Amino acid sequence: NGDIIPVPKKDLPVTLPKDVDLNCKGNPLDQHPTWKYTKINNEEVIRETDTLDTFVDSSWYFLRYIDNENTEHFSSTQAQKDWMQVDTYFGGAEHTTMHLLYSRFWQKALKRLGLVEHKEPYVSRHNRGLILGPDGNKMSKSKGNVIDPDEQVALVGADTVKMYLAFMGPYIGANYPWDNGGIAGIHRFLERVYGLSDHVVESIEHNETTKLLHKTIEKVTRDIAEYKFNTAVSALMIYVNQAEKTGLSKDSYEMFIRLLAPFAPHLTEELWYSLGKSESVHAQLYPVSDPSIAADEEVTIGVQINGKLRGEITLS
């Protein structure tokens, strides 16, 4: 008659049937011939078949991804030892009391059943911010401030959009308004990168340019690890400014392309093949800085007297 009737405690837990057809259309429990029909207090009732929220699926998918061809276990112990835990969980603030909470609960339940190795599924958790409309408000069709990324890609290219998003600000925890002037600036920068080969010189490269490249590699590598993509992009821009002024060697040019590749994958692929390379730039080793080249020849030390800066000493 449509009444909701709770299952008596003595009948808990309600176990699911094992002879379900998982390949049927719709909900397998709905298609089962007998399971959903039962009695409570001698009254015939129909069990609820919509039993699992979609958050249940997203609470353990990573355990299956690492061993998705295993037909004996949902996730083997060896696969979990090789891959788990998830290094970093990125999500919005709304996940804190929703998906994050559910997936941690699910992991602890699986741990209690002896099916997983760790009590916690994630090593670290970071909030990511929102891209706001040009007016500084959350994008909304009703406000007319929605930026369509597909339209932007068609207008200025995927690399420009990707690199502009990286340049907007620190990735973690902040919101940033879309700025058409900002994305135009990134587009101009990539056009300069496209023409950087014109500044490759046959002569010996200027020492300061070589030093700056190795410093840039250090900075970009460190910033990527700390999710500070905006300052990594800034360092790349500073290097291009220097290279355009002094010229750069072919080796430095190739190192720079490999360094830029994660930020502008399509442009760097084209530039890489233009050098006569037979393999993708994305199959190459990431550039490594030489500390002896990157090291400063002079160090400035502040001199303090009674806690106040009184001067500086420069040592070579």
Residue locations for each model-derived region?
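Acidic, turn-prone loop/beta-hairpin segments
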Residues: 2-9, 13, 132-133, 203-219, ...
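Structured secondary-structure scaffolds
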Residues: 1-201, 212-241, 251-260
